[in-house]
A protein has these predicted regions:
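Hydrophobic residues on the short alpha-helix immediately C-terminal to a glycine-rich phosphate/catalytic loop
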Residues: 28, 236-237
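Catalytic histidine-centered segment of alpha/beta-hydrolase-like enzymes
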Residues: 221-230, 234
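Short glycine-rich catalytic loops that host catalytic nucleophiles or stabilize transition states
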Residues: 214-221
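Flexible "cap/lid" subdomain of the alpha/beta-hydrolase fold that forms the substrate-access gate
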Residues: 1-16, 20-213
Length: 239
């Protein structure tokens, strides 16, 4: 990120990130406040370094495991997602959206809390939309499917496989706080905000991000914050 800022003129910059991009943005601001004057996290809030390896704290039961644990074994998720790349993309995008969450409300399946059934798969409790949501075009699906068909899913999944290593590398920063001005934006239907521990982290986020200027929860919005609600996200980031 520092190299990108250098290439674009030197900054200091405002950095924003969504999903895995959010920890990248939060930690860029944490580590280099001289190069990043503000930070915006979408979906994933800043989470201070815990006292145990992240993978050891992830939930699992006799029937299901947390999806990030499912992603750990090389080749397993890649094989599942690559069987039909276009269908996988449609299922993931729809099931994570506000529309998808409403369509599957009350089903009571393990996916409701980010769990993957043992002996099943990540896509088992997903479905392709009968009608795509208005923010998702077939051109979008074709582009994403083309890129994943070309490059595969391993690069993205390796982010999950590196969680414990990143935790090790951040040991010198245990207890560190993000000190630059910050904003957190998420949808109230985003599964991320319903993960275990979020009910304690989100109300106390300002303890770890003292210059947090606001937490914005978008009603009815799912995981794909900036796709589902582009105007609201743009308005919030420019305010």
């Amino acid at each position: 990120m520092v190299g990108l800022v250098d290439a674009l003129g030197g900054g200091p910059a405002v950095i924003a990130g969504h999903d895995w991009g959010a920890p990248v943005a939060w930690h860029a601001a944490l580590l280099r406040p001289d190069r990043f004057r503000a930070v915006i996290g979408l979906s994933v809030p800043y989470r201070p370094r815990g006292s145990v390896r992240p993978s050891t704290a992830m939930p699992q039961t006799a029937d299901a495991i947390f999806y990030q644990l499912y992603f750990q074994a090389p080749g397993v998720a890649e094989t599942e997602l690559s069987r039909d790349v276009r269908s996988s993309i449609r299922r993931i995008l729809f099931s994570g959206s506000g529309e998808g969450r409403r369509a599957h409300a009350g089903l009571g399946n393990p996916a409701a809390v980010g769990m993957v059934p043992r002996g099943g798969g990540f896509l088992r409790h997903t479905a392709e939309p009968a009608t795509p949501p208005p923010w998702l075009t077939e051109a979008d699906v074709e582009f994403y499917a083309g890129e994943f068909s070309r490059a595969g899913f391993r690069g993205g999944l390796n982010w999950y496989r590196n969680i414990d290593r990143n935790w090790e590398l951040m040991a010198p920063y245990a207890g560190a706080r993000v000190t630059v001005p910050a904003l957190y934006v998420a949808g109230d239907q985003d599964l991320v905000v319903h993960f275990r521990g979020m009910d304690q982290l989100l109300p106390n986020l300002k303890k770890f991000v003292p210059e947090l200027r606001g937490t914005i929860m978008l009603p009815g919005c799912g995981h794909w914050t900036q796709q589902e609600r582009p105007k609201e996200v743009n308005d919030a980031t420019l305010a």
